[in-house]
């Protein structure tokens, strides 16, 4: 993975509105907005090809990016990305400015690991049901992780891991947990595999009896 995906060239745009955004997309460009840190929001234009290549990497969504805005470097993270409903196109981006000395809030992906080693799954036939695929965290830009691992090794059948069970990197806190115990959301549950229904078992038995006759 090239570090180049974390640097994007952008231009300030003054031609705003739906019509202007539509024209930009026809020119293979992506409209965007940059905001945050108490500064005025700025409308931007970026190369669609560069954005599309970068967004194929998971780390692009949970990494501090460098925007070269008309020659000036700005540190930011992706806050929102809109896509075309059926075409492989990015239609709009939201960037949030970051300051090295100020904590930021953003979502990072969860990586569920060791499901193949969990006895509840490997031996007892359970399956892991993921209740979320990412988690909102708060941290300084330097502490921003690309992802957070959720270790399923010791999760038993019927057991659920919650946010409070997840080991977060040093300097990283859960935004939801900071709101109180009521926000200790479920992350993953190992559920018992569903067996055949009683009706299907009875049908099988009747079929076997009929075959025997």
Curated annotation (Swiss-Prot):
Q: Cite a single GO MF annotation.
A: structural constituent of ribosome
Q: Which Pfam family would be a valid example here?
A: Ribosomal_L25p
Keyword annotations for this protein, in alphabetical order, are: Ribonucleoprotein, Ribosomal protein, RNA-binding, rRNA-binding
CDD domains this protein is in? Answer: Ribosomal_L25_TL5_CTC (cd00495)
Q: Which terms in the GO cellular component ontology are assigned?
A: cytosolic large ribosomal subunit
Instruction: From the UniProt entry, list the residue stretches annotated as the region Disordered.
Output: 192-213
Q: By its UniProt entry, which Gene3D superfamilies does this protein fall under?
A: Ribosomal protein L25, beta domain (2.170.120.20), Ribosomal Protein L25, Chain P (2.40.240.10)
Annotated function: This is one of the proteins that binds to the 5S RNA in the ribosome where it forms part of the central protuberance.
Q: How is the quaternary structure described? A: Part of the 50S ribosomal subunit; part of the 5S rRNA/L5/L18/L25 subcomplex. Contacts the 5S rRNA. Binds to the 5S rRNA independently of L5 and L18.
Indicate what this protein is called per its UniProt record: Large ribosomal subunit protein bL25
- Which organism is this protein's natural source? Pseudoalteromonas atlantica (strain T6c / ATCC BAA-1087)
Organism lineage reads as:
Bacteria, Pseudomonadati, Pseudomonadota, Gammaproteobacteria, Alteromonadales
